């Protein structure tokens, strides 16, 4: 992968949300923190043809197992599903389309805490737009957020109003995508949260909000716990709201308390299902990530591992290859998988589970304003009662009818509406 310095950001105007200690670099268009000695360097996504040829040859050379002995996905990704994916990937898929899409936005890298961090930074043309940093999870990437960049930065062209505009910052997690892979331990969600605070300070934003789901939620909520004065509020689509007594009962396989409301019982059942049927991927990556050499060496191995994220998300991801109605296209799915392959980040991204010290879904004690969008096909749909206890300053809660783990990706129009509503009260 070659790094070049010929990508130009759109011209922008300074506004009240930008620190006086920053300037706009004439070459890159990015904000530069005058107090920081670390430069913000333009970045271009570019892979050689030889890498794409090698990918195709590896797909075609796959050694296939016999089909599963059941007629469903209870044993894992079904052979017919992954073979349909392989056929499309090898014969019809075009990486250059998403590469061009990525390069249509200003991309940058900057060194934070010894690591080169990649991020997309798109500033709105509208004055007083609200800066937002949006963090992906696993098995996601910055590709998850591409569909919401233009609606957020240019709301008047996408059914919104000027007052709903955002300046958008989308970083790649360390060891993911185009960010540098850590060569030593210690890059866990707390450290990443501190790095994101540094990034927003380096970009010169003295007032901003943050959003995340999956690992992005952990990072975003920890930013909320750290509560730098610049961070006004956060939004999450996979909130950490489960009360300690409920979480303890679920971990120890106790029966559901009789006092749960219908919404709480639904959440209980979803988490119980996830702990019993959907946690294997996280347990493997959390205990022995380096053992997963197969997903680093085989594109089909990587694709199957990503498809089988968890049983509930598997339905959302894999159904496009099973000729079912879907919100994600075949290209959507393969854009993301191919990014993992070309950047060689299958194992480096898995190590985040090994590094992690945050308990899944456990309340973290965020005291700043929080907005929650609860999607029905998420790992669990957080009840409002739990959200109110977890977040004393809950400024927005909406229980959606459609959408799941990849909400911004699969339901980008609905997700955009949620972003506009979530932060309306703090602008």
Task: Describe the predicted segments one by one.
Residues 95-97, 160, 173-187, 221:
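Glycine-rich "HGGG/HGxG" loop immediately N-terminal to the catalytic nucleophile
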Residues 151, 155-157, 205-256:
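Conserved hydrolase catalytic core segment
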Residues 190-208:
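Conserved acidic catalytic loop of the alpha/beta-hydrolase fold
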Residues 138-150:
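The serine-hydrolase catalytic nucleophile loop
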Residues 283-427:
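C-terminal subdomain of alpha/beta-hydrolase-fold enzymes, centered on the catalytic histidine
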Residues 129-137:
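Short beta-strand element of the alpha/beta-hydrolase
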Residues 51-123, 128, 332, 341, ...:
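Non-catalytic accessory segments flanking enzyme active sites
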Residues 152-178:
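Conserved alpha/beta-hydrolase
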């Amino acid at each position: 992968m070659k790094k070049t310095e010929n990508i130009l950001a759109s011209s922008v105007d300074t506004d009240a949300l930008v620190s006086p200690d920053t300037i706009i670099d004439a070459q890159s268009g990015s904000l530069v923190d005058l107090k920081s000695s670390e430069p913000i360097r333009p970045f271009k996504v570019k892979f050689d043809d030889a890498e794409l040829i090698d990918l195709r040859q590896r797909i075609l050379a796959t050694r296939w197992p016999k089909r599963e002995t059941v007629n469903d996905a209870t044993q894992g990704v079904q052979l017919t599903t992954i073979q349909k994916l392989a056929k499309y990937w090898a014969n019809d898929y075009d990486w250059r389309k998403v590469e061009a899409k990525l390069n249509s936005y200003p991309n940058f890298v900057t060194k934070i805490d010894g690591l080169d961090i990649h991020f997309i930074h798109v500033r709105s043309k509208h004055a007083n737009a609200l800066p937002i940093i949006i963090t992906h999870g696993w098995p996601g990437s910055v590709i998850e957020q591409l569909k919401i960049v233009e609606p957020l930065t240019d709301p008047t062209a996408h059914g919104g109003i000027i007052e709903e505009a955002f300046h958008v910052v989308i970083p790649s997690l360390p060891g993911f995508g185009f960010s540098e892979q850590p060569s030593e331990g210690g890059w866990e969600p707390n450290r990443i949260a501190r790095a994101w605070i540094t990034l927003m300070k380096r970009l010169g934003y003295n007032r901003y909000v943050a959003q995340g789901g999956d690992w992005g939620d952990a990072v975003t909520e920890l930013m909320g716990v750290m509560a730098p004065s610049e961070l006004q509020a956060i939004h999450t689509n996979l909130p950490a709201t489960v009360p300690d007594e409920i979480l303890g009962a679920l971990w120890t396989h106790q029966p559901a308390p009789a006092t749960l409301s219908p919404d709480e019982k639904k959440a209980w059942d979803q988490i119980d299902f996830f702990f019993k049927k959907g946690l294997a991927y996280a347990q493997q990556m959390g205990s022995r990530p380096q053992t997963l050499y197969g997903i680093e060496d085989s594109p089909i191995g990587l694709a199957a591992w990503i498809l089988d994220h968890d049983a509930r998300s598997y339905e959302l991801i894999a159904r496009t290859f099973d000729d079912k109605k879907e919100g994600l296209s075949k290209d959507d799915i393969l854009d993301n998988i191919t990014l993992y392959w070309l950047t060689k980040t299958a194992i480096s991204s898995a190590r985040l589970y090994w590094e992690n010290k945050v308990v899944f879904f456990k309340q973290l004690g965020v005291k700043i304003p929080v907005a929650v969008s609860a999607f029905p096909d998420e790992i669990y749909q957080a009840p409002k009662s739990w959200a109110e206890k977890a977040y004393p300053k809950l400024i927005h809660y909406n229980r959606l009818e459609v959408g799941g783990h990849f909400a911004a990706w699969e339901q980008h129009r609905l997700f955009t509406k949620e972003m506009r509503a979530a932060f309306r009260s703090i602008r």
